[in-house]
C-alpha cells in the first residue's frame, strides 16, 4: 500500500502505478490545484486541452480524476487508486484524514510531497507515521525548503526539517518548534533511522532539491514491510 500526500496534477500517481504494478495507491490532496498557478508550456500536466497561462484548478476529486485519466488508458489502474480529500496544513483536518485512511493502512510507503513547508513536513510525519507498517519507509520530498528563502523558517535554522533530523541522528533526540512534546517523543520512539540526500540543480525555480527517508522501527518479532 502506497500513500502520497500532495498529488498536484497527478503525474506522480501515474508514475507510482507504473513503478508499483500491484500496489494499492492512495492520493491525499485538496484537489483544488495550486492557488494562482498558471500552466506553462513545459508543464506536461497542462496538456489536456489547456493552454499556457490558463489557471488549472479542480472543483472536486471527481473532476481531478476525469482530467487525470483524459487521453490515457487508465481503466485498469483506476481500481488500484483511491483519492482522499484533506488539508495537510490543518491539524484538526488531518485527524479526520487519518481516520479515513485507516481502512487502507498500514502503508508500506508514505511519500509526503505537499506544501514543502517545514512545519507541514514535520507534523505530517508525526500524524502519519502511526499508520506506516513497521519497517516501512516514509519519504519527505523537497527538503530544499530547509535551505532556501520563502518558506516558514530561515534557511538552515534549527527548526528546519533537515536540521531537526540531523540533530535526531546525532543525539537520538527530536525537537522542533513545529512539534508538541508528545509528538516529538512519539517520533523518537518510532523512528529507527533517517537518511537525507540533497542535490544541486540548475533550474530557474529551484537551485537544489532533496529528500529524507525515514525508516520506522520494526515490531519485536515482526517482519518488515513488503514492497
Feature-to-residue mapping (PLM):
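S-adenosylmethionine/decaboxylated-SAM
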Residues: 1-227
Amino acid at each position: 500500500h502506497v500513500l502520497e500526500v500532495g498529488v498536484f496534477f497527478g503525474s506522480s500517481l501515474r508514475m507510482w502505478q507504473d513503478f508499483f504494478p500491484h500496489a494499492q495507491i492512495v492520493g491525499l490532496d485538496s484537489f483544488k490545484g495550486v492557488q494562482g498557478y498558471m500552466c506553462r508550456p513545459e508543464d506536461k500536466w497542462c496538456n489536456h486541452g489547456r493552454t499556457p497561462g490558463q489557471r488549472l484548478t479542480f472543483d472536486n476529486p471527481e473532476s481531478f480524476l476525469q482530467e487525470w485519466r483524459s487521453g490515457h488508458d487508465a481503466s485498469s489502474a483506476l481500481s488500484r487508486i483511491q483519492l482522499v480529500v484533506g488539508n495537510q496544513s490543518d491539524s484538526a483536518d488531518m485527524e479526520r484524514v487519518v481516520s479515513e485512511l485507516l481502512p487502507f493502512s498500514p502503508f508500506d510507503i508514505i511519500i509526503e510531497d505537499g506544501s514543502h513547508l517545514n512545519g507541514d513536513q514535520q507534523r505530517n510525519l508525526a500524524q502519519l507515521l502511526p499508520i506506516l507498517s513497521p519497517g516501512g519507509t516514509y519519504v519527505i520530498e523537497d527538503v530544499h525548503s530547509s535551505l532556501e528563502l520563502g518558506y516558514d523558517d530561515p534557511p538552515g535554522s534549527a527548526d528546519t526539517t533537515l536540521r531537526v533530523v540531523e540533530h535526531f541522528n546525532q543525539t537520538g533526540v527530536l525537537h522542533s518548534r513545529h512539534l508538541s512534546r508528545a509528538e516529538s517523543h512519539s517520533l523518537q520512539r518510532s523512528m529507527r533511522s533517517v537518511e537525507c540526500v540533497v542535490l544541486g540543480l540548475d533550474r530557474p525555480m529551484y537551485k537544489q532539491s532533496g529528500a529524507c527517508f525515514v525508516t520506522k522501527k520494526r515490531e519485536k518479532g515482526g517482519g518488515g514491510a513488503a514492497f
